[in-house]
Amino acid sequence: SRRQRQICIRDRQVDTPQNLYQKPGNLFVAGFMGSPQMNFLDAVISEKGGNLIAKVGDHELAIPAAKAKALKDGGYVGKTVVLGIRPEDIHDSQMFIEASPSAPMTSVVKVYELLGAEVFLYFDVNGTQVTARVDPRTTAKTGDPIKFAFDMEKSHFFDKETELTICN
């Protein structure tokens, strides 16, 4: 698009396409911008060892300090929020998984979609379908178990009731 600014009239967010994508003001904008759209998972914010974690089912995801501060200051500890993660921020490379502060998550690939320079993997996390955009050199195929990790530095958190962004 050649436009410098886009307007999401429904939700009154006026910004550059890049900012709408990277810093959505609410769930609608987050889901509207990008293809495939952002993945949304319910997460309970908890404290563990002085740090905040997002619990998605049995998975505990370490929350980066700046996001943890916003969640804590907003009174979200002990509450369910919506965790948003873009498909390109889910990684199946061993190097990323080993460097992740959270334990790797596991699932089974339901669909493998090769698009040339990228691959989309579709699988479930805690009963919710998730889409990951990964390197085409991935060895994962339909039916394979997969280990993956979220890049929590690029995660988004939304208030479950108001659907407004808590932090990007």
Sequence positions of predicted segments:
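Single conserved hydrophobic/aromatic residue that forms the stacking wall/gate
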Residues: 1-11
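A residue-level detector for short acidic-glycine micro-motifs
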Residues: 45-47, 89-92, 111-113, 136
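Residue-level detector of high-confidence beta-strand sites
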Residues: 13-14, 112, 168
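Structural detector for short beta-strands of small beta-barrel domains
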Residues: 36-48, 101-112
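Short acidic-hydrophobic catalytic motif
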Residues: 18-22, 30-33
